[in-house]
Amino acid sequence: LVISASPRKGGNSDVLCDEFIKGAQQAGHKVEKIFLRNFKVNYCTGCGVCNSTHKCVQKDDMAEIMDKMVNADVIVFATPVYFYTMDAQLKTLIDRTVPRYTEMVNKEVYYILTAADTNAANLEKTVESIRGFTLDCLDGAVEKGILYGTGVWDKGEVQSSAHMKTAYEMGLHS
């Protein structure tokens, strides 16, 4: 399951998702992409109802996405990096997993990050924030790969970079 949190269709992280998918499909894997931009996922209101019911009271697309996350063997989290953290779309999705995140066990996880910054070390804060969910909250989660898509600012700029090959190969070996 590839989760593209890019707010832009054809944005850099979204383009790398497609390359990852090509590689994974070449390896014979069945892959589904969720482009969060096309789904309605409201912010968590902190009401706490889900603590006892394991269901969110909000009527949006999160239940459908959550089912896919629970059933996936592999989850790719892809986000542009804004101010050295994940974008709002991915953070909102993660916050909304509270009712069922304990059902997401033994997942293999990958991260695809894109940023204008050219120094991959500066993206570690973003990786750590995603790991706070995947490795610290999901039982048995195993981190399988990270793509630091650095040095890309303009929409689609990543297409002329070596990051494309890296994304494809990461998918191929997923």
PLM regions and their residue ranges:
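N-terminal beta1-alpha1-beta2 submodule of the flavodoxin-like/Rossmannoid cofactor-binding fold
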Residues: 1-78, 84-100, 142, 156-174
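Cofactor-binding loop segments of dinucleotide-utilizing enzymes, especially the Rossmann-like FAD-
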Residues: 3-5, 36, 113-116, 149
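Short, highly charged low-complexity linear segments
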Residues: 78, 107, 136, 149, ...
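Short, glycine-/small-residue-rich phosphate/pyrophosphate-handling segment
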Residues: 88-89, 101-146
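Short helix/strand-capping connector loops at secondary-structure junctions
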Residues: 145-155
